[in-house]
Amino acid sequence: MSRLWVTGYRSYELSIFSDQDPKLKVIQNALKRKLIEKVESGTTWIIAGPQLGTEQWSLELANELKMDYPELQTALMFPFSDFGKQWKEEKVEKLALIKAKVDFFANVSENPYQNPQQLRNYQNFMLNHTDEALLLYDDEHEGKTKFDLNAIRSFQEHNSYNVETIDFYDLEEESMLYEEKDE
């Protein structure tokens, strides 16, 4: 059993505000390609948080992949119990759909948001309950995911933990493949 933590840019950090944005198709193709590679090399669990963007896209893709890879399971982990309560209704509904399709759901903290320590506890939980991580992230273009990457790098100092990134160069390559396929 191998468990993969997937995280990365939030949708707004990539200026993606619609499911019809052409950038999203390229990102989804890159994520799907990497998820398939991971599943075919032994990953049995895809585990992500509820953030808009990479985390939700990854769970949607992983849930689709379960048709071809029935051994694959998905988990959605909330850092605290009232995550997303301030979101617009359509975003809350989309998260509820994802939550309904995953194989496992839990809150790392059963309390509503109280302080940033809950987010660090979430990172520690993810690191201690996964074997490796996949990040949609580019060090040259910082975003909130830098906090997860820093936690991973710190964890790696004392633990064997692999991290792979899909960066903007990878997305550029994926974009060229996508354009070739479209022609």
Swiss-Prot record:
Which Pfam family would be a valid example here?
YpsA
InterPro entries noted in UniProt: YspA (IPR010697)
What Gene3D superfamilies does the record point to? 3.40.50.450
TM ranges are none
As for family, the record states:
Belongs to the UPF0398 family.
Q: What is this protein called?
A: UPF0398 protein PEPE_0933
